[in-house]
């Protein structure tokens, strides 16, 4: 029964499911930067809050990657998109009233939610279906991308607020620096 249900969700029979093409080529909106002849940025143009500039994995400081994994998904390298131990921890926290048990979403699930957002106001059944969809999309993302590519997409897409979308914009807006110059405590 459970596998059949996941098959229906995965096949898009129970609501939206991104196509293989959409998973392989997610829409990314990066800011357009205008440079002077001497290399200084004259201006930026971006849509909505998508004030971001792409950053390669090799250019992301290890301290930023370590901070992300330590705070969001300590078993990131040990799962395939769904952290079953984390889900049991959250369920136990809900049953015992322990609100400090933390969340159960993995970095990949959070990326799935960022890449394929859905309506915010939903009833319990719609929320449950959205969570199942996130799990399926997370597993598909893990099959399509390396862990490094997932971290790169996440850090280039995450909204740090105040028009700081992506690690490049966040480092600049909050610390007036570039990601490679962030101190460990800033990461």
Where is each model-derived feature located?
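N-terminal type II signal-anchor transmembrane helix
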Residues: 1-35, 75, 95
